[in-house]
UniProtKB/Swiss-Prot annotation:
Organism: Mus musculus
Residue ranges annotated as Mitochondrial matrix topological domain: 130-137
Regions of this protein lying in the Mitochondrial intermembrane compartment: 28-110, 156-265
Pfam families with a match to the protein in the record: ApoO
Protein name: MICOS complex subunit Mic27
Domain of life: Eukaryota
Stretch list, region Disordered: 187-215, 229-265
InterPro entries per the UniProt record, alphabetical: MIC26/MIC27, MIC26/MIC27_animal
Length: 265
Protein backbone atom coordinates (compact mmCIF):
# COMPACT_ATOMS: atom_id res chain seq x y z
CA UNK A 1 0.00 0.00 0.00
CA UNK A 2 2.78 2.37 0.87
CA UNK A 3 4.48 1.66 -2.43
CA UNK A 4 1.22 2.23 -4.33
CA UNK A 5 0.71 5.59 -2.62
CA UNK A 6 4.26 6.67 -3.33
CA UNK A 7 3.84 5.70 -6.99
CA UNK A 8 0.58 7.59 -7.16
CA UNK A 9 2.11 10.71 -5.65
CA UNK A 10 5.00 10.55 -8.09
CA UNK A 11 2.78 10.08 -11.13
CA UNK A 12 0.48 13.05 -10.41
CA UNK A 13 3.19 15.79 -10.51
CA UNK A 14 4.64 14.22 -13.66
CA UNK A 15 1.23 14.32 -15.35
CA UNK A 16 0.72 17.94 -14.37
CA UNK A 17 4.11 18.93 -15.74
CA UNK A 18 3.41 17.12 -19.03
CA UNK A 19 0.00 18.74 -19.37
CA UNK A 20 1.38 22.23 -18.69
CA UNK A 21 4.10 21.70 -21.30
CA UNK A 22 1.52 20.63 -23.89
CA UNK A 23 -0.67 23.68 -23.19
CA UNK A 24 2.28 26.01 -23.51
CA UNK A 25 3.35 24.46 -26.79
CA UNK A 26 -0.19 24.75 -28.12
CA UNK A 27 -0.32 28.44 -27.19
CA UNK A 28 3.01 29.08 -28.90
CA UNK A 29 1.83 27.29 -32.01
CA UNK A 30 -1.32 29.43 -32.28
CA UNK A 31 -0.78 32.50 -34.55
CA UNK A 32 -0.81 35.83 -32.88
CA UNK A 33 -4.13 37.69 -33.53
CA UNK A 34 -4.28 41.49 -33.72
CA UNK A 35 -7.45 43.38 -32.84
CA UNK A 36 -8.78 45.72 -35.55
CA UNK A 37 -11.05 48.73 -35.02
CA UNK A 38 -14.34 48.94 -36.98
CA UNK A 39 -13.24 51.98 -38.96
CA UNK A 40 -10.16 50.03 -40.15
CA UNK A 41 -12.26 47.39 -41.87
CA UNK A 42 -12.37 47.53 -45.70
CA UNK A 43 -16.10 48.32 -45.71
CA UNK A 44 -15.41 51.69 -44.03
CA UNK A 45 -13.17 53.20 -46.70
CA UNK A 46 -13.11 56.96 -46.08
CA UNK A 47 -12.96 59.26 -49.12
CA UNK A 48 -9.73 61.15 -49.71
CA UNK A 49 -9.43 64.49 -48.00
CA UNK A 50 -8.41 66.51 -51.06
CA UNK A 51 -11.17 65.34 -53.40
CA UNK A 52 -12.40 67.63 -56.19
CA UNK A 53 -15.26 67.23 -58.63
CA UNK A 54 -14.07 67.46 -62.21
CA UNK A 55 -16.75 67.83 -64.85
CA UNK A 56 -16.40 65.58 -67.79
CA UNK A 57 -15.19 67.45 -70.86
CA UNK A 58 -16.98 66.81 -74.16
CA UNK A 59 -15.09 64.95 -76.80
CA UNK A 60 -14.36 65.95 -80.37
CA UNK A 61 -17.39 64.11 -81.75
CA UNK A 62 -19.73 65.70 -79.22
CA UNK A 63 -18.36 69.17 -79.91
CA UNK A 64 -18.75 68.66 -83.65
CA UNK A 65 -22.40 67.66 -83.28
CA UNK A 66 -23.01 70.66 -80.99
CA UNK A 67 -21.54 73.11 -83.52
CA UNK A 68 -23.59 71.60 -86.34
CA UNK A 69 -26.74 71.80 -84.24
CA UNK A 70 -26.24 75.47 -83.28
CA UNK A 71 -25.50 76.43 -86.89
CA UNK A 72 -28.53 74.62 -88.27
CA UNK A 73 -30.81 76.08 -85.56
CA UNK A 74 -29.62 79.62 -86.40
CA UNK A 75 -30.23 79.22 -90.13
CA UNK A 76 -33.55 77.45 -89.60
CA UNK A 77 -34.77 80.33 -87.40
CA UNK A 78 -33.59 82.88 -89.98
CA UNK A 79 -35.38 81.05 -92.81
CA UNK A 80 -38.51 80.72 -90.67
CA UNK A 81 -38.61 84.47 -89.96
CA UNK A 82 -38.19 85.26 -93.68
CA UNK A 83 -40.94 82.79 -94.55
CA UNK A 84 -43.34 84.35 -92.03
CA UNK A 85 -42.52 87.86 -93.28
CA UNK A 86 -43.12 86.89 -96.90
CA UNK A 87 -46.29 85.00 -95.98
CA UNK A 88 -47.74 87.96 -94.06
CA UNK A 89 -46.80 90.34 -96.88
CA UNK A 90 -48.44 88.17 -99.53
CA UNK A 91 -51.58 87.73 -97.41
CA UNK A 92 -51.83 91.48 -96.77
CA UNK A 93 -51.34 92.23 -100.45
CA UNK A 94 -54.00 89.73 -101.47
CA UNK A 95 -56.42 91.11 -98.88
CA UNK A 96 -55.74 94.68 -100.01
CA UNK A 97 -56.35 93.67 -103.63
CA UNK A 98 -59.63 92.01 -102.69
CA UNK A 99 -60.78 95.05 -100.72
CA UNK A 100 -59.76 97.39 -103.56
CA UNK A 101 -61.60 95.23 -106.09
CA UNK A 102 -64.76 95.23 -103.98
CA UNK A 103 -64.46 98.98 -103.42
CA UNK A 104 -63.87 99.75 -107.10
CA UNK A 105 -66.59 97.39 -108.21
CA UNK A 106 -69.19 99.41 -106.32
CA UNK A 107 -67.60 102.83 -105.82
CA UNK A 108 -69.43 105.68 -104.05
CA UNK A 109 -70.81 108.54 -106.07
CA UNK A 110 -68.07 111.06 -105.15
CA UNK A 111 -65.15 108.66 -105.62
CA UNK A 112 -64.32 109.50 -109.23
CA UNK A 113 -64.37 113.30 -108.74
CA UNK A 114 -62.11 113.00 -105.67
CA UNK A 115 -59.67 110.76 -107.51
CA UNK A 116 -59.68 113.25 -110.37
CA UNK A 117 -58.78 116.10 -107.99
CA UNK A 118 -55.93 114.09 -106.42
CA UNK A 119 -54.57 113.04 -109.83
CA UNK A 120 -54.77 116.58 -111.18
CA UNK A 121 -52.91 117.99 -108.15
CA UNK A 122 -50.18 115.37 -108.57
CA UNK A 123 -49.78 116.17 -112.27
CA UNK A 124 -49.66 119.89 -111.47
CA UNK A 125 -46.82 119.27 -109.05
CA UNK A 126 -44.99 117.17 -111.62
CA UNK A 127 -45.32 119.87 -114.27
CA UNK A 128 -44.20 122.63 -111.90
CA UNK A 129 -41.04 120.74 -110.95
CA UNK A 130 -40.02 119.45 -114.37
CA UNK A 131 -37.12 121.92 -114.66
CA UNK A 132 -36.05 121.67 -111.04
CA UNK A 133 -33.80 119.32 -109.15
CA UNK A 134 -34.54 115.71 -108.31
CA UNK A 135 -35.76 116.66 -104.87
CA UNK A 136 -38.33 119.05 -106.38
CA UNK A 137 -39.43 116.42 -108.89
CA UNK A 138 -40.20 114.08 -105.99
CA UNK A 139 -41.43 116.55 -103.37
CA UNK A 140 -43.79 118.69 -105.49
CA UNK A 141 -45.98 115.89 -106.91
CA UNK A 142 -46.19 114.08 -103.55
CA UNK A 143 -46.93 117.30 -101.68
CA UNK A 144 -49.69 118.46 -104.02
CA UNK A 145 -51.22 114.97 -104.22
CA UNK A 146 -51.25 114.78 -100.41
CA UNK A 147 -52.86 118.20 -100.25
CA UNK A 148 -55.57 117.09 -102.68
CA UNK A 149 -56.21 113.89 -100.68
CA UNK A 150 -56.46 115.95 -97.49
CA UNK A 151 -59.07 118.20 -99.06
CA UNK A 152 -61.06 115.26 -100.40
CA UNK A 153 -60.81 113.05 -97.27
CA UNK A 154 -60.48 115.33 -94.23
CA UNK A 155 -61.49 112.81 -91.50
CA UNK A 156 -59.09 110.11 -92.67
CA UNK A 157 -56.36 112.71 -93.10
CA UNK A 158 -56.77 113.86 -89.48
CA UNK A 159 -56.50 110.27 -88.18
CA UNK A 160 -53.41 109.58 -90.28
CA UNK A 161 -51.86 112.88 -89.18
CA UNK A 162 -52.42 112.04 -85.49
CA UNK A 163 -50.86 108.60 -85.82
CA UNK A 164 -47.92 109.97 -87.78
CA UNK A 165 -47.42 112.78 -85.25
CA UNK A 166 -47.37 110.34 -82.32
CA UNK A 167 -44.82 108.13 -84.04
CA UNK A 168 -42.66 111.13 -84.94
CA UNK A 169 -42.84 112.43 -81.35
CA UNK A 170 -41.82 109.04 -79.92
CA UNK A 171 -38.91 108.80 -82.35
CA UNK A 172 -37.75 112.33 -81.52
CA UNK A 173 -37.89 111.54 -77.78
CA UNK A 174 -35.76 108.45 -78.27
CA UNK A 175 -33.21 110.42 -80.28
CA UNK A 176 -33.19 113.17 -77.65
CA UNK A 177 -32.62 110.67 -74.82
CA UNK A 178 -29.76 109.04 -76.72
CA UNK A 179 -28.08 112.40 -77.38
CA UNK A 180 -28.63 113.43 -73.74
CA UNK A 181 -27.02 110.25 -72.42
CA UNK A 182 -24.00 110.77 -74.66
CA UNK A 183 -23.71 114.40 -73.54
CA UNK A 184 -23.89 113.48 -69.84
CA UNK A 185 -21.20 110.84 -70.29
CA UNK A 186 -18.91 113.38 -71.93
CA UNK A 187 -19.55 115.93 -69.20
CA UNK A 188 -18.80 113.38 -66.48
CA UNK A 189 -15.54 112.41 -68.12
CA UNK A 190 -14.37 116.01 -68.15
CA UNK A 191 -12.46 117.00 -65.04
CA UNK A 192 -14.15 119.54 -62.86
CA UNK A 193 -12.10 122.55 -61.59
CA UNK A 194 -10.95 122.09 -58.02
CA UNK A 195 -12.21 124.72 -55.55
CA UNK A 196 -9.60 127.04 -54.11
CA UNK A 197 -8.70 126.43 -50.49
CA UNK A 198 -9.38 129.41 -48.32
CA UNK A 199 -7.10 130.33 -45.49
CA UNK A 200 -8.15 129.79 -41.91
CA UNK A 201 -7.87 133.49 -41.17
CA UNK A 202 -10.29 134.41 -43.95
CA UNK A 203 -12.77 131.80 -42.74
CA UNK A 204 -12.56 133.05 -39.15
CA UNK A 205 -13.12 136.64 -40.35
CA UNK A 206 -16.18 135.54 -42.30
CA UNK A 207 -17.55 133.68 -39.28
CA UNK A 208 -17.07 136.71 -37.03
CA UNK A 209 -18.70 138.95 -39.61
CA UNK A 210 -21.68 136.64 -39.99
CA UNK A 211 -22.32 136.36 -36.24
CA UNK A 212 -24.44 139.15 -34.72
CA UNK A 213 -22.91 141.59 -32.27
CA UNK A 214 -24.04 140.44 -28.83
CA UNK A 215 -22.40 143.30 -26.90
CA UNK A 216 -25.09 145.84 -27.71
CA UNK A 217 -27.63 146.58 -25.02
CA UNK A 218 -31.11 145.17 -25.36
CA UNK A 219 -34.11 147.28 -24.35
CA UNK A 220 -36.40 145.53 -21.85
CA UNK A 221 -40.06 146.28 -21.22
CA UNK A 222 -41.06 148.60 -18.36
CA UNK A 223 -42.45 145.87 -16.07
CA UNK A 224 -39.26 143.81 -16.25
CA UNK A 225 -37.15 146.94 -15.73
CA UNK A 226 -39.09 147.96 -12.58
CA UNK A 227 -38.87 144.43 -11.18
CA UNK A 228 -35.12 144.36 -11.64
CA UNK A 229 -34.77 147.82 -9.98
CA UNK A 230 -36.77 146.67 -6.92
CA UNK A 231 -34.70 143.50 -6.59
CA UNK A 232 -31.46 145.44 -6.83
CA UNK A 233 -32.57 147.94 -4.17
CA UNK A 234 -33.67 145.18 -1.78
CA UNK A 235 -30.43 143.29 -2.15
CA UNK A 236 -28.10 146.32 -2.07
CA UNK A 237 -29.42 147.91 1.17
CA UNK A 238 -28.81 146.17 4.58
CA UNK A 239 -32.27 146.66 6.08
CA UNK A 240 -33.06 145.20 9.59
CA UNK A 241 -36.37 143.49 10.23
CA UNK A 242 -38.31 144.91 13.26
CA UNK A 243 -41.29 142.73 14.26
CA UNK A 244 -44.50 144.18 15.65
CA UNK A 245 -44.85 143.41 19.41
CA UNK A 246 -48.60 143.09 19.09
CA UNK A 247 -48.21 140.23 16.69
CA UNK A 248 -45.68 138.33 18.83
CA UNK A 249 -46.81 134.99 20.27
CA UNK A 250 -45.71 134.34 23.90
CA UNK A 251 -47.24 130.92 24.25
CA UNK A 252 -49.61 130.41 27.25
CA UNK A 253 -48.76 133.65 29.12
CA UNK A 254 -49.01 137.34 28.61
CA UNK A 255 -45.91 139.48 28.96
CA UNK A 256 -47.38 141.24 31.97
CA UNK A 257 -47.97 137.92 33.81
CA UNK A 258 -44.52 136.49 33.34
CA UNK A 259 -43.82 136.59 37.11
CA UNK A 260 -46.71 134.20 37.80
CA UNK A 261 -45.00 131.27 36.11
CA UNK A 262 -41.77 129.58 37.13
CA UNK A 263 -38.98 129.30 34.68
CA UNK A 264 -37.55 126.11 36.13
CA UNK A 265 -37.13 123.30 33.69
Amino acid sequence: MAAFRMGKLTTIPAGLIYASINVRLAKEEEPKKQLVRPDQLPIYTAPPLHSKYVEEQPGNLQRGFASIRTTTVYYIGWCKSIYLFMKNGVMDTVQFGKDAYVYLKNPPQDFLPKMGVITASGLAGLLSARKGSRFKKIAYPLGLATLGATVCYPAQSVIIAKITGKKAYATSQQIFQAIKSLWTQKSENESLPEPKEESKEGRSDEIHASLPDLKHSVSLPKELASATVIKSESTSGTTQFIPDPKLMDHGQSHPDDKDMYSTRS
